[in-house]
């Protein structure tokens, strides 16, 4: 599985930037990862061309870690892009192209925090796939 995370704007909050960098470093031990930052929401889709598209959206489906793991296993061998919008969310065109609209929480999360939570969950899924004991159900 080849993962790409495309986010609007680089994290400016120190804790988010450091956390995203740390989880990206850890994830690359288990799978190829591209971490791409764009300036505007309209730039997300071109960066996800040829990928399954998982769009983070507060109106999306809430999945457990195990459900996300199973969904990604079903896409094994494919390229999967996770699209994280900016402070204004996603343009409608991005939501319409989604293979999966995913909500990380019923709470509204600041976009940098949402990116950090996504990175941790992707790391968790990859360690689960590898049989590493990081995830404890």
Curated annotation (Swiss-Prot):
Substrates-to-products reaction catalysed: pseudouridine(1915) in 23S rRNA + S-adenosyl-L-methionine = N(3)-methylpseudouridine(1915) in 23S rRNA + S-adenosyl-L-homocysteine + H(+)
Leading EC class: transferase
Top-rank lineage group of the source organism: Bacteria
Residues that, per the record, bind S-adenosyl-L-methionine: 56, 85, 104-109
InterPro entries: Alpha/beta_knot_MTases, RlmH-like, tRNA_m1G_MTases_N
GO CC terms, sorted: cytoplasm
GO molecular function, one term: rRNA (pseudouridine-N3-)-methyltransferase activity
Subcellular location: Cytoplasm
Keyword tags: Cytoplasm, Methyltransferase, rRNA processing, S-adenosyl-L-methionine, Transferase
Enzyme Commission (EC) number: 2.1.1.177
Similarity-based family: Belongs to the RNA methyltransferase RlmH family.
Summary of the function given for this chain in its UniProt record: Specifically methylates the pseudouridine at position 1915 (m3Psi1915) in 23S rRNA.
Subunit structure: Homodimer.
Protein name: Ribosomal RNA large subunit methyltransferase H
Gene: rlmH
């Amino acid at each position: 599985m080849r993962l790409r995370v495309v986010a609007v704007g680089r994290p400016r909050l120190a804790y988010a930037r450091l956390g995203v960098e740390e989880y990206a470093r850890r994830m690359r031990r288990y799978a190829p990862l591209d971490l791409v930052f764009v300036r505007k929401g309209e730039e997300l889709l071109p960066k996800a061309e040829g990928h399954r598209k998982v769009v983070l959206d507060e109106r999306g489906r809430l999945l457990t870690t195990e459900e996300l793991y199973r969904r990604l296993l079903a896409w094994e061998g494919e390229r999967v892009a996770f699209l994280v919008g900016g402070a204004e969310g996603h343009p409608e065109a991005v939501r319409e192209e989604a293979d999966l609209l995913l909500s990380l929480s019923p709470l509204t999360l600041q976009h940098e925090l949402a990116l950090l939570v996504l990175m941790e969950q992707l790391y968790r899924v990859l360690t689960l796939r590898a049989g590493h004991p990081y995830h404890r159900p």
